[in-house]
């Protein structure tokens, strides 16, 4: 970097601030003379120049520090987001490995994975409730039996869902003569993923 050759600046000595207005000192001429105006002008210019440089450099340091903080915060945020996505993808992969599906050569998409998982859970719930004849072992406790309550709650949800599907089907002009079982729906869905993927 090239530097300019500048002559050294002369600094004015600090003025005695305790001198009285009428008192004349070598550094401070008597008020009313033309010299005091010159001294005031020099002092204000040097104060502005030195103070101005300090403020500008402080501003530069401040804005540079803010930029560095902003960049650092952004990098940390990006790293947190990267870790979050990595954990999410690992969880999806673990779910893909647990859900039975036919095609192992092609990875299921996230929406396919979630849909299959939801339907698989529904089919397992229906199977368990059917096999246990509305009683779940291990849930029996003194008082009212929780097995039938769970069974009733499940059937209530299924009825609501079927009603919503019927309303949606009626709006679209589609009618279902016979509702499919959960396992049959699940196997149909697996087959459609196999054919479509």
Curated annotation (Swiss-Prot):
Q: Which residues carry this modification: Phosphothreonine?
A: 12, 25
Q: Which PROSITE patterns match?
A: BHLH
Give the protein's biological function: Plays a role in controlling the transcriptional activity of MyoD, ensuring that expanding myoblast populations remain undifferentiated. Repression may occur through muscle-specific E-box occupancy by homodimers. May also negatively regulate bHLH-mediated transcription through an N-terminal repressor domain. Serves as a key regulator of acinar cell function, stability, and identity. Also required for normal organelle localization in exocrine cells and for mitochondrial calcium ion transport.
In what ranges is there compositional bias, type Basic residues? 1-12
Keyword annotations for this protein, in alphabetical order, are: DNA-binding, Nucleus, Phosphoprotein, Repressor, Transcription, Transcription regulation
What Pfam families has UniProt attached to this entry?
HLH (PF00010)
Task: Name one cellular component (GO) term.
Answer: nucleus
Q: Where is the bHLH domain?
A: 72-124
Annotated region described as Disordered, given as residue ranges: 1-82, 178-197
Descriptive protein name: Class A basic helix-loop-helix protein 15
- Enumerate the subcellular locations listed in this protein's record, separating them with semicolons: Nucleus
Q: Indicate the principal place this protein occupies in or around the cell.
A: nucleus
GO BP terms in the entry = calcium-mediated signaling; cell differentiation; cell-cell adhesion mediated by cadherin; cell-cell junction organization; cell-cell signaling; cellular response to glucose starvation; endoplasmic reticulum unfolded protein response; establishment of localization in cell
Locations of Basic and acidic residues compositional bias?
65-82
Task: Give any GO molecular function from the UniProt entry.
Answer: RNA polymerase II transcription regulatory region sequence-specific DNA binding
- Per the record, what phenotype accompanies loss of this gene's function? Mice display incorrect granule organization in pancreatic acinar cells and other serous exocrine cells such as parotid acini and gastric chief cells. They also display mislocalization of mitochondria and Golgi apparatus and reduced Ca(2+) uptake by mitochondria.
